[in-house]
Amino acid sequence: MNSPLNNGAASTGNNVASIGAGTASIGVPFTIDTEVFFRNCNDFTARFPEQAARLGLNRQETALQCLQAVPPAYRLLQAKAKGMERTPTLSVNGSFVHSKYNPQEEARRILVSDFFQTAEVQSRCIFTGLGLGYLASQYIERFPAAEAVIVEADSNVFICFLASRRLDSFFRHRRLSLLIGIQPEEAASFLASTGWNSKILFKAPIFAEAYRQWYKTFFTLLERNKMKNSINAKTLERFGTLWLKNTVKNLGLLCSTAKVSCFKNAFSDAAAVVLAGGPSLTAHLEIVKKSSKGFIIIAVDTAMRACLRAGITPDFILSFDPQYWNYLHTAGLDTSKSVLISEAAVFPAVLRQCYRAVFFSNSSVPFARYLEGEGQNGDEDYTLAAGGSVATTAWDFARYIGAKPVIMAGLDLAYPHKQTHFAGSTFEEAVHTRSTRFASAEQANFNSLYSAFPSLHQDYAGSTVLTDRRMLLYAWWFESTLAKYPEIKTFNLMPRGVLIPGMSACSAEDFVGLIGGLPRTAIDERLEAIVKNAYSQTFLDGCGARERQLAASVKTMTEAAADLAVQAEKAGKLCRRLAECGGEEGTGKSGKSGNGNRTREQAALIAQLNTLDEKIKDGFAKDLVEVLCFSDESNADSSVPPMAAAEKVYGRICLMAQQVHEIFKKR
């Protein structure tokens, strides 16, 4: 093989090349066999054609150009250990990604570390940072049935990897996923959709300065997703049954209530002001009240009391919380001039109030879809986003009706000046009403401030403001959603809370210039026309057919819940029998004569269990289990034997199904 050329970042000869050979020497340049490089590119293209085309590695001429374009800071060098001259190591910006002496031995030592000794990691591992792939290659060689997910932000490192050696066995690995040179949001989204946790995430050091921010963003997104899943798990555990009970109590309204789909893009020529319930709302209401220009007013239920006190009548009120305490925000108020936007799982008393009209969005709870039916008001999906706060749903409704721009008021997502709510809010009044010498209002306010993992976060003024983990999750929802819909210009009116990238601050003067476009009279007339059209005689005449369809759905769900309870009980008994006949370590009788019989019995029991699992995972049962038996994986007790843990899960499903059956029977 010829000696490497030293005339650039990546130098090529007849069938040889070197990367970074022209820089100051920190080692002997490794000579690349371009035939090996092209062969690896072909294998990569065959396995991941879209990524190969995006990176320009799907054709020899463009692949060679990519190899030649590798910057001088990336250097393939010969390993320094004796006999390792044909083994490359990689240097980036003068720092070695692997051992400069023996990178293969280094990978072997990492692979026998504690991190790789768990069964979970040995079945699936996520590598953030590939380097020359020594660790990943040894991992899939040692655990051939394992799934390997590799995230490498730096495409130059990946090109060095392809140029390092033959990688036939690497690309033949059946359960291999590569995410090369993509945006951190895409990588985080992939892991969110396929499942991940920190126990299987192996973080490699970052040597390219240009990609430090990439990995910082990526890990931040993963943590946000982890936090979201944790909060969702607690929410489902707390409210799953309540959602179902409320939905069943509200069944009568499902057939006679129109859907929000009639508002889609209905106000594309109007601005919208969304009134959230943060501490700054009181000051914002004065600005909204003084304006004489026309704009849509969308209020969350928590802000309704303050709106009426300020003399503001919202066009829309949004209420989605299933709890009684949330109903108190609007209880006793005159809501007759506003349109309610809600869903079937809301607390029933909310729907008994008088409104200009009521419209339902699709429920965000999966099992409710079986009751809502299809085709009642068009076949399109009219589910409003549920970012954890009614303010996120209100913004999405403003987007749904086509409003531009959208101006958020009272959206602090923080505790400016240590205020938890706006003056005169239901929470504040309740705190003062219940305060005693031993449980003062100040103590209640302190508990509210410091019970949800408080922290300081950057605000719009460049300083910091007190917030908490839950509020930051809402802020992150706005940040990611605004990036998804850049055409929806959104502003934050005189903000005092957490800085939300993509949501610019808006002064009182700016507010006057942003609103307007559609006169108030035109807004009222259009709203009236939409309501009349939605509740037309044709719609009212169709209530009978929808009631019959709903009755059939209720009957099916009642029977399905009873059947699910039976199936889960059978599955629990099978788990117990599996453990008793030797399905758990340390159980079962000894003796060779019984081994064959026990093996056959175990196989038969497992086959029966698999059949029951398929039934449980089907249709309505699957959605019930997902919502009402949701469990946070981080709380799993690894010390419990698998069959005992499975029996516990089936017991929980059985109990849940029995409860659901009773709820439907008592309807």
Language-model features: where?
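Catalytic or ion-translocation cores adjacent to nucleophile or general acid/base/metal-coordination motifs
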Residues: G294-M304, R309-C354, N362-S364, G373-Q376, ...
